[in-house]
């Protein structure tokens, strides 16, 4: 069946015809038959260079042989037990060892579940009710973080989705990114804040990068007011390097959430932090968290294989950063927009300068992006279909792929 036919069927059986809204490409999404390396093959027989990489998890590319080997070996032994497995302490030791100050980890099944549990834990540890999130920061699809607030520093949250109770998100406040002074002002006047949760690099509207000293400043401010700092590194964890953004920028959060890359392409999440805080998680403490699929052996086997491969190939990170730089260099300064990159994350913003926060991101010309995306798609290049999603490179992108990407940007901008 062709993609259009499949989508016609799906619309009758599934809301919007998709399992996640971002996949609802107009007029209909392509359906993938298989993928290998940096390429997707659609059911219509098209070959596409993939710069979406499943929205971040596939740092090593599609169907990496080491990951396949680890999954296949575990499949022979079974794929779900409902009991602890030897993978759990092994993987927890790997992850905590890669992040300074991180002492304990709890595995869950998604990044959303990880941030939900981390927020609950922060409230349980501090005894305080409210959280702060950054405008434009994405932390999953649970109620506490589905908030769209005004630009005022003290504006209370209002729901960003039908079905979310205003009384619940009244405990979620928003602040602009790259504004440490706004954080200081809020904490000076509000004493009910349990935690600030933040993507150290805004990935779901970007990448939008932290200005000099911003992350260190918010670390100092939260510490001074007894507020926990939660780094949501579901995207940046192992994407920017071993140790993620916190190692890159030299900032130690109290709690960290991980996902995407640590599962090697299988569903996973983790929340991690200091033993003093993590010890409150059940069954050791009173903060409840549980899940049938938490720590499932397939995901952990794939995750361990991924992280061990990264340890064995440290050159991947400078190599990926160079690949992203080369794409930016191919564009030059004459296209009228702004190319932003960090590590293997990159984006061309249809705005004359790199955005510093959510307000500036919203100034981008989304119609121009739509036309650009269609042109790139016609050239066999698959970018995330939104001005507000990050592009990702992988270890599998070859020099030929990069040349095609550079040529596409040059021709389509």
UniProtKB/Swiss-Prot annotation:
Gene Ontology annotations of biological process type: protoporphyrinogen IX biosynthetic process
Source organism, top-level taxon: Archaea
Pathway(s) annotated for this protein in UniProt: Porphyrin-containing compound metabolism; protoporphyrin-IX biosynthesis; 5-aminolevulinate from L-glutamyl-tRNA(Glu): step 2/2
SUPFAM superfamilies linked: PLP-dependent transferases
One of the record's GO cellular component terms: cytoplasm
Record EC number: 5.4.3.8
UniProt subcellular location: Cytoplasm
UniProtKB keywords: Cytoplasm, Isomerase, Porphyrin biosynthesis, Pyridoxal phosphate
Matches recorded under Gene3D superfamilies: Aspartate Aminotransferase, domain 1, Type I PLP-dependent aspartate aminotransferase-like (Major domain)
CDD domains the UniProt entry points to: OAT_like
Name of the protein in question: Glutamate-1-semialdehyde 2,1-aminomutase
Native organism: Methanoregula boonei (strain DSM 21154 / JCM 14090 / 6A8)
């Amino acid at each position: 069946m062709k993609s259009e036919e499949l989508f016609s069927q799906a619309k009758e059986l599934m809301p919007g015809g998709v399992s996640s809204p971002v996949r609802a490409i107009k007029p209909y999404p392509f359906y993938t038959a298989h993928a290998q390396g940096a390429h997707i093959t659609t059911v219509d027989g098209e070959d596409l260079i993939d710069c979406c990489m499943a929205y971040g998890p596939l740092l090593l590319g599609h169907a990496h042989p080491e990951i396949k080997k680890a999954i296949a070996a575990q499949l022979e032994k079974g794929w779900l037990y409902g009991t602890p497995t030897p993978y759990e302490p092994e993987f927890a030791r790997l992850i905590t060892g890669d992040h300074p100050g991180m002492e304990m980890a709890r595995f869950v099944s998604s990044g959303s579940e990880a941030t939900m549990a981390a927020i609950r834990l922060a409230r349980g540890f501090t005894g305080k009710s409210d959280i702060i999130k950054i405008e434009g920061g994405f932390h999953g699809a649970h109620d506490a973080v589905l908030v769209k607030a005004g630009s005022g520093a003290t504006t209370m949250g209002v729901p960003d989705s039908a079905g979310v109770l205003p009384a619940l998100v009244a405990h979620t406040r928003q602040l602009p990114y790259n504004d440490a002074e706004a954080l200081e002002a809020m904490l000076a006047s509000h004493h009910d804040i349990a935690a600030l949760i933040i993507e150290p690099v805004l990935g779901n509207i970007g990448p939008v990068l932290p200005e000099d000293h911003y992350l260190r400043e918010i670390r100092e401010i939260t510490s001074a007011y007894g507020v926990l700092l939660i780094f949501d590194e579901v995207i940046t964890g192992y994407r920017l390097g071993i140790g993620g953004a916190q190692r890159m920028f030299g900032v130690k959060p109290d709690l960290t959430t991980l996902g995407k890359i640590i599962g090697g392409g299988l569903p996973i999440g983790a929340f991690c932090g200091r033993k003093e805080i993590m010890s409150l998680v059940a069954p050791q403490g009173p903060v409840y968290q549980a899940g049938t699929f938490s720590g499932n052996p397939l995901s952990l086997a794939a995750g361990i294989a991924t992280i061990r491969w990264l340890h064995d190939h440290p050159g991947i990170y400078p190599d990926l950063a160079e690949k992203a730089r080369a794409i930016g260099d191919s564009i030059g300064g004459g296209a009228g927009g702004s190319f932003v990159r960090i590590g293997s994350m990159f984006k061309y913003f249809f705005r004359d300068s790199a955005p510093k926060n959510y307000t500036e991101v919203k100034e981008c010309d989304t119609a121009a992006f739509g036309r650009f995306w269609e042109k790139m798609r016609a050239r066999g290049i698959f970018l995330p279909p939104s001005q507000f999603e990050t592009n990702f490179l992988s270890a599998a992108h070859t020099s030929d792929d990069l040349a095609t990407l550079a040529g596409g940007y040059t021709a389509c901008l």
